[in-house]
Amino acid sequence: MTDIVVAIDGPAGTGKSSVSRGLARELGARYLDTGAMYRMMTLAVLRAGIDPADAAAIGESVWKVQMLSDHDRYFLGGEDVSSEIRTEEVTQAVSAVSAIPAVRVRLVDLQRQMAEGRGSVVVEGRDIGTVVLPDAPVKIFLTASPETRARRRNDQNVASGSADDYDRVLAEVRRRDHLDSTRAVSPLYVAQDAMIVDTSKMAEAEVIAHLMDLVKQRSGAVW
């Protein structure tokens, strides 16, 4: 099988993570969640007591942060923080930290190192096809209505035991959309050569099967 790089972008709540994992499994490829890397950086900032809006202080510390991704487990300075990076505190701060130029420079460099020249890989995030891997042969942009994404996130929160409110989650989804699409560095937008997939009315298995078809069409490879 020919090695293939698949870049998957889209806003929060479109099913990027679960679909990307499933696609990687079907392809026999590695999976890289770049959003988790921004969450690790955000956690490091919060632990250091730095204001998430203090670009100067964060810029000075960003190169000292040591992080590792291994089979969907995430390590910060050798500590497994896979659960902690998904807390509400990190979620509230991650867009602000991600918008800081020094953070993006550092993490884009790490992401390219992790993705390139190491076999087939599915990389998911918000600027993979436009900034991190602009030459990726397969680019996919997942989308869904804000209401659908808020409902999914709310259901996840309730299922995990953290009571939530749909209206609050919807407001947070819209807030993050605005921050992600208007930030000065690497804003979220659809790459010109990306294939757009609306997941609003699709089950996870349907999305994965559809993406497999798109990968085959775009790459010409056979699995």
Swiss-Prot record:
The keyword Manganese does not apply. GO terms for biological process: nucleobase-containing small molecule interconversion; pyrimidine nucleotide metabolic process. The keyword DNA damage does not apply. Its EC number is 2.7.4.25. It comes from the Bacteria. GO terms for cellular component: cytosol. InterPro entries: Cytidylate_kin, Cytidylate_kinase_dom, P-loop_NTPase. Its main location: cytoplasm. Coiled coil: none annotated. Belongs to the cytidylate kinase family. Type 1 subfamily. NCBIfam families: cmk (TIGR00017). This is Cytidylate kinase. It comes from Mycobacterium leprae (strain TN).
